[in-house]
Amino acid sequence: LGTRLITGFGKQLRFGGEVMKNVAGYDLSRLMAGSFGCLGVITEVSLKVLPKPRQSLSLRLPLDAEHALAKLAEWGQQPLPISAASHDGQALHLRLEGGEGSVAAARERLGGEPLDPLYWQQLNEQELPFFRDPRPLWRLSLANNSPLLALPGEQLIDWGGAQRWLKSSASAEAIRTAVAAVGGHASCYAADHCDSPFQPLAAPLLHYHRQLKAQLDPQGIFNPGRMYAEV
């Protein structure tokens, strides 16, 4: 909801607030979450928290990736208590959360077999067998209704299709071109496999990045070159 940070000028600024629909200051707090420490030192964060669901149930459904994406698009238009969805290349994994009645009704409708909830922690910590593949790791960010990309290697679908992990030896150019064709971008998690970890920016976007950096950190003190060499 809000942040406090120290800028390159040595000033402490506050963006956002501590309640929903707060209009105090410019809404730059969201930018800080993905800035990798390039815009300032975060000293305080205000977060929105939610109560723990009364019921949680994880399921495994034997669907291939293409059919899983189609089902997720269909279920996304329906009032189902799906809080997480992932496909590990073998099956679709779902987490249902909410009231006892709604979770039970969804289980009856969707079918599947029980899944150890530890799966979600292992996915979050990248401890699943998929991540042991020695090939370079890529994070693909794209619309959740994007089709399965025809890229060499293995893919793991997360966030209901909006985040996809790729293990592939394909070139950075080939991967980023394929992802850009569906309106997404690709980040490389193998430092020795690509020149920059992030998708190259178009000239107008790079201009905005430079201007924002100049406003908060004109001396280039904070993490210079971490995101882009030009910033």
Predicted regions and their residues:
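Short, surface-exposed charged micro-motifs
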Residues: 2, 84-86, 154-156
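Conserved glycine-rich FAD pyrophosphate-binding loop
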Residues: 89, 113-231
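A conserved active-site cap/scaffold subdomain adjacent to cofactor or substrate pockets
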Residues: 54-118
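Short beta-strand-to-turn element immediately C-terminal to the catalytic PLP-Schiff-base lysine
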Residues: 6, 44, 95-97, 166-168
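FAD-binding subdomain of flavoenzyme oxidoreductases
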Residues: 1-81
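A short, polar/proline- and glycine-enriched secondary-structure boundary/capping micro-motif
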Residues: 24-26, 105, 176
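Short helix/loop capping segments that flank catalytic or ligand/cofactor-binding pockets
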Residues: 14, 103-105, 224
